[in-house]
């Protein structure tokens, strides 16, 4: 449903942000 879709998008955005920060730190 809509709530699960929102949670999935939020989780994906959180992982993407974490990956971006990790990538910047590793450089």
Swiss-Prot record:
Keyword terms, alphabetized: Antibiotic, Antimicrobial, Cytolysis, Fungicide, Hemolysis
Keyword Zinc-finger annotated: no
Gene Ontology annotations of biological process type: defense response to bacterium; defense response to fungus; killing of cells of another organism
Known role: Has antimicrobial activity against the Gram-positive bacterium M.luteus and the yeast C.albicans. Has hemolytic activity on human and duck erythrocytes.
Identification of the protein by name: Dermaseptin-like peptide
